Amino acid sequence: MNGLQRQFLQHVVDKTCADKHNKGFSTWDQLLVMVYAHISGSTSLRSLLSRFNSHEAQHYHLGTQVIKRSTLADANRKRSVEAFKEVCDGLLQQAHRRVRKDGQDLLYLLDSTPIQLKGYGYDWAAATRAARTQGLKLHLQYAPQAEVPVNATISTPNVNDIEEARHLAIEAGTTYVFDKGYCDYNWCHAIDQQDAGYRFRHLR
């Protein structure tokens, strides 16, 4: 978590009032435990907190505490995602600045991947399902030289890749690589007009 400045996080929390109704369980606590969920590959709150709470000796150094399952469940349900979105955007901008500073010819890969959400509790996802996917779609702009993502958005699965790509700020001197899902010759022309280049990636 060294890459995330607590001062920046606190600024976001104050701006979005993320801790207003959750004073006993801060945004920092929730962020820590959900990052740990990803790292540990936990698939349920029970297994997640069993693992997380077993490291109680390290909690003090991280500025967190032992967490109850009901507390985390309530926070996941009630706390706005806005603070986490702003933190993510801030980290992506930080990565983007690092990529630009390297001074190399820039290459960006554009792609998307589905996030399946089916079964109990995911009925809401059925209304926007695509032919093969129900859930969400992650759209990613990736800098392979630095091995970091520099932009990420989430949409419903029935949103075409090109629709999200049109919102990207094209950078001069950059080459964009994408598959035929991004084929829109007007958009390709717009890339060319910004003194950038593009390549179509052939799917195997």
Model-derived features with residue positions:
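Conserved, well-structured functional cores that handle cations and Mg-NTP chemistry
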Residues: 1-204
